[in-house]
Each structure stands twice: as C-alpha cells, then as structure tokens.
Amino acid sequence: MSMLSCMKRDLVHHGRLAVAALVFFAGCGSSDGDDTRSYLERTLAQQFVSETSHLVTLQTYRTEDPQSEQLVVDNLARSRDYLMGLAQEFNRGQSTLKLEPFEWRRAGPTQTQWVFGFRLGSGPKKVAILAHLDTVPPGNADWRPFEPRVEARDYRGAAQPFLVGRGAADDKGPAVLALIVMRALANRYDGTNALDGLTVELLFDTSEETDFSTAYYFQEVGVPDFGIVFDAVWTVRAEKGIERPIFTVPLGAAPSNGIFIEAFNSAPGATNQIPDTVTARINGNDEAALDRLAANVADLYQQYGFDDPLYRRAPLEVSRDAKAVVLTTKVIGAQHGSVPDENRANGASPVVSLANFLAHLVDDATLAPNGVGRMLQFMAWGWGTTVFGEKHPDLLERHDQVFEQGNGTTYALTRVTTSPQDVALRIDIRYALGHHGVAWDGKTEGQLPGTSVFPDAFEQLVNRFQQDRPGQAVTVATVNAASPDVRDPQSPRFQRISGAYERAVGAPMPLAAIGGGTDAKGQVNLVAAGPLFTLAFGPPINYHGLNEGAPIEDLQLSARILYQIMLDEIANKTTR
C-alpha cells in the first residue's frame, strides 16, 4: 500500500475517532476547565454556522478579469468589518483581556497585499493562528455557492451535517473557528496575567489562493515563534513543490476543407482547480460532415478506447450552434488541482476526457488538423489519461522517501483556452523532491533552495513530441511557484501539536505529505494542521469544487484541538 493510501486510511480512521471524541472532550477537565470549555462549546454550537454563513455570502474569489480585484477587496473589507463587529461585541463582556484588531496593507503589482486580524496580549513571544478569507471561483453557479445552508451528506458511512457554500471548508469555516478559539482563550484568561510575555495572534490572509499576502507581511514584521496554519489536514509534514507551465500552439489559418476544432475552452477558473466543464466547438465548410458528426459523436465517444480500458469518461453533451457542433464535458469528483489522482481514481476530468477523444478524431482524419487539434494531440501524447507522468517517466515521473509512489509528482491539466492567436494549456503541477534542482539532504527542515528542473524537462518533452509527431511546434514557458518544503515530525513543535491532538482525540496524530500549498510553506515556525481529518478532497467535501461542504462535526472537533494547542502554548510560553 502506498504512503498516500496509508495516510488516507489512517486519516479516515482518525476521523471516526474524532467524531466519537466529541462527547468525551466536552465533558473533560477541572471545574474551571469546564467553565471555559462550556464557553467554547456554546459558541461552537450557537455561532459557527451563522458566522461562517455570513462570510460565505460575500464573494471573495479572483478571476483573470482585472475588474475582479476591486470587487474582491470590497467584499474582503465587508468581511473584515463583520469580524471586527463580532470582536467588539465580545470585548464588551471582557474586563482586561480583549481582542485587539490590527491590519497591514500595501499595494502589490496586481493584487492588494493585505493581512488583518486580532491579538491577545502584547508580549515579545508570538504564537499565531492563520486562516484565509479569499476563495477559488465557484464554477457553475447552479449549486448556489453564495447561499449557505446546512444539509445532511453521507460521510464515512453515516449521514452528517455539512455547511454548504463556497469557502465553507476552504477556508472561511476554519477562519471562524479560529476566531471562536481566540474568544474562548480571552474568556478563559480574562483578569489574569497568563499572557504576560506572550502575544497570541490570529491572521487572516486575503490572497492565499493567488499570492500569499502573509509572506509579504512576515518579510516586513517577522515570523511568529510558533503558529498553526488552519487550512489543510492533521498534520502536514511536507508540501510538494508547485510548477505552473503554459504550453502554446499558434492557431494559424482555419483549414480550407473539411471540419475542424474551432475552439476548445475550459470554464473560467483558477489553474489549481479542475474545471466543471469544457466546451469544444467544431466547424467547417462541409455541412454534411458536421451533421454526421452531430448524429454520431456521442456513440463515437462512448466507443472510443482510452489508453486505460477502465478509464471513466466525463459525461458528454452534444448541441448545435448554427451549423457548428458543440461538445461539452462535465466534471465528476474531486476538483482540487493538487489531487488529480483522486479525480482519476473516483471521478472524471472534462479536460482529459474530451482532449483525448478529439485528438483521436484528428489522428484518424475525421477532423482536419489545425492549432487546436495539434495541442490536443500533444496533451494525449504527453499525458493521455495519466496523472503521474507515466507516459514519459524519464522526464515526468518522480517519487521519493517523503512523497512515496502513489503520492509523487502529479499533473492536473486544468486550463485550455483558445484565442484568435493561439491555444494555450495550463497545468497545475505538484512535484516531488526528484523534480527539484537542489537535492534534499534528508534532515534540514523547511523549503528547499533553488528551483525546479522542469524548464529543461519540458524543453526535452516538446522536442521529443516534434520528433515523434512532426508538425506545428509547441512552445513552453514555466514558472516555479514554490519549492518543496519538508519538516521533521520528531521536532519539538510537532511533538507539542501531537500531544494536544492526542489529548483531544484520544488517538495518535496522523502525518501527511501533501500537494496543496499553504501559508506554512517556507516558514519553519509554522505548521499546517487541521481542520480536516481526511485527504479525500472530492465528494462530499468537494474542496475547490462544485457543492463545497464543510463537515460541521469534524471542524468543531478541530477547533477543540486548536484550543488545546493554544492552551499548551500559553501554559509553556517560555518553550521555543
């Protein structure tokens, strides 16, 4: 069994224990502890859903449209004002220990770099909780992403309540939990000197999905001595590197005869998000051929033999627009760009399904070759339906002692766009240690120095394609968005988190090596931990996907664990 499979099994097991621990945790502790825990429990029960729901109604996703930035900033300001109002209301009942708001902001090249939040205490040692209030785009609006509601979903074999809406799980729900924990801490230590020498800080990132404002903030004010990034799973010991290549082919002149792929476009969205739909438009001067294709293409699609006979193809819809044939495929399953393997195993990618099928129709001359067809041929040749780079393992496939086989470098082909000039493919790559230019020494914690080996690997790849399949050249430009980050699970900070987890849950803390990028990357004092207990990002959670939902019981237990971590940090505030 691969490391990833083991982690999925262990995290689900711990999730079951987590739900069972709810009653245990609520009833444990001294009489003073009971009073403070009752505040935490009461606030979780009465305010988590309503406060998160308010944030979910505010659209805070960025798009490629330059006009989206102002809308996002305006709604983030509304989010800030709402949270500040909650803090002010809470502070009225406090005598000495109050939530003190802070804000850091500056203009960036394309986006506002902005962090805000609350502090308890003012000591030189700083302990932090991080969450973010921006989200990825909602995709198809039919699922009512900004109309939060609670519904029962089957989760680990039983019906559980889920809060549904964009950001409920990533990361507005966790952000509200963090604020509830801060209020519980202030309630517990009001009128005491327990926080002397210590500052507990809650930071809300406003651009985690795109630009990581916290990184700029830390450059200016310094990194906390210890912090929990509440935006992942329990508990991240390594994050893969992130690479973002763009492959392009010139569109060229339309074929003068026959029918051809006029455009191939994924639905608007982020590169780290498998799109909910992909649409291909087929046109040409042979109307009889277009009619035949419209009549037969659904059967051809069902009969087409993908490179894996067990491959699950995305649902296809066929329509007409004037004489053109329009093909639309729809996503099934996980949509987070860091887990294309989960989508491949349990769902279907609309990009991969339609690209491979149409490349075949170009190969067999049903469709005339052009720039779009050339790009789809490159996609089918380079990756087919695979996600680990198996078609060109010498260049694309890597796994290692941290990111083991089954959890190595992944390729999510997420964005294909056709313009009047060219067709472009964007890939979300989460890469293992072997794709980095500087080897890990096996012991040093943190982000690896240097950059990836992908520029050379991709140059070899496109040259190999040109040799194997001569035709219009594919060009590539790539950006190394982040290098891998590896931690020591035996370090004191991990052991402190583990101790709090075990006291709250009654079971050992799991460890995960993930593809997702968090605010902890590059900051060795920060650990990405919680709020989820599973690496399964597809249904019913649907991380970055349609019908995103937060398992309420799991998230509330995560708040209890986070609270225990903070209690321990305050009790041992001289510990580094």
Across the structure, where does each feature detected by a protein language model lie?
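Bacterial N-terminal signal peptides that target proteins for export
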Residues: 3-18
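C-terminal motif of bacterial Sec signal peptides marking the signal peptidase cleavage site
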Residues: 25-27
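N-terminal helical capping/dimerization or prosegment-like subdomains
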Residues: 32-139, 422-429, 436-440, 451, ...
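Zn-dependent metallopeptidase/amidohydrolase metal-coordination segment
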Residues: 40, 157, 326-336, 419-421, ...
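His/Asp/Glu-rich mid-to-C-terminal helical/loop segments that flank catalytic regions of hydrolases
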Residues: 48, 340-371, 444, 448, ...
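Active-site metal-coordination/substrate-binding segment of hydrolases
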Residues: 124-204, 221-222, 549-557
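Acidic, glycine-rich active-site loops and adjacent beta-strand->loop/helix elements
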Residues: 133-135, 199-214, 221, 230-235, ...
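Midchain, well-structured core segments that form catalytic/ion-binding scaffolds
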Residues: 215, 220-443
